């Protein structure tokens, strides 16, 4: 795991942070995660507008694909050539804080600035009472459904629970052809998360109250058996473990999947790539007791502690988190608003898709901000792949995964 290697390179001490980031005086550099083809052009607009308002500061962005972002940061930090600012997955933040890499931002923020944010999305970046990151991207997860397939299959409403989902998926399968009831992700980023949706609905959390893994609990087992039964009954697309999130989304956009769970950015993709597709957005199905959960996600901007231009870097952050620039970014990428004033804009208030996601926020869980989280997520993903492929009985696979996760949690 990259974070483990990354930690190992820094455990010798924090002398690396004494190395200056390579920005010149008056220059601010920011590493940016690429969310879509719109990301780069947006930040070019920001650069032009910011430099026009701040003639003494040069602003440069480096846009990096998500799948290599952590490796890029690892390399730059190890060499002392990191930028002044960077977007990171908030779930990585604790590692950056523990290694003294992220600068606390509270000393730069006044009440007006802090008051811009919706607390739900700012709080994951607060550790031990200090704010180390600002939420630049936020989303939750909900269930998309294909209205045309529902109509053909005689389904009137989206399923309220997993039993109804299985029944509806069977009706869609019965239509024949390349029609799949439920799109199930089985590889790459968020394979573990797709499992958590069912796990949460069966009353199980990722971590038990005593801090141990929840993977060996009865609810975790029932959730795994649920997904495996859908695979065995042919209610999902074939070859689940060869489908990443984007692959399942593509099947949905092609009109081949009746239901799938994903983020609000799919709505933007449908409007641009499949404008004739009739779809709806509904809550993730509930479990036997009515419990349900969605995945809340934030990405944060951090300031590096070794930045030579912190005051200038803060000006960039203040600029980026103004309402109009936030709204343009959020709407381009299909995220949820993190700015209170932005959330009041007509675009959000009158957007039925986003309203469906917002309604689920009271049930949102965020990835635990704990050391070793990425390794634990990998363990969970690998376990689910083994179960989906039939390489082991769910009970045994989950107990083994829980033991591996607990070993990390005890470190």
UniProtKB/Swiss-Prot annotation:
The complex is composed of two ATP-binding proteins (BAB2_0493), two transmembrane proteins (BAB2_0490) and a solute-binding protein (BAB2_0491). It comes from the Bacteria. It comes from Brucella abortus (strain 2308). Belongs to the bacterial solute-binding protein 1 family. One of its GO terms (biological process) is maltodextrin transmembrane transport. Transmembrane segments: none annotated. This is Putative binding protein BAB2_0491. SUPFAM superfamilies: Periplasmic binding protein-like II. Residues 1-25 form the signal peptide. GO terms for molecular function: maltose binding. One of its GO terms (cellular component) is ATP-binding cassette (ABC) transporter complex, substrate-binding subunit-containing. Keywords: Periplasm, Signal, Transport. Pfam families: SBP_bac_1. InterPro entries: SBP, SBP_1_CS. It is found in: Periplasm. Probably part of an ABC transporter complex. Its main location: periplasm.
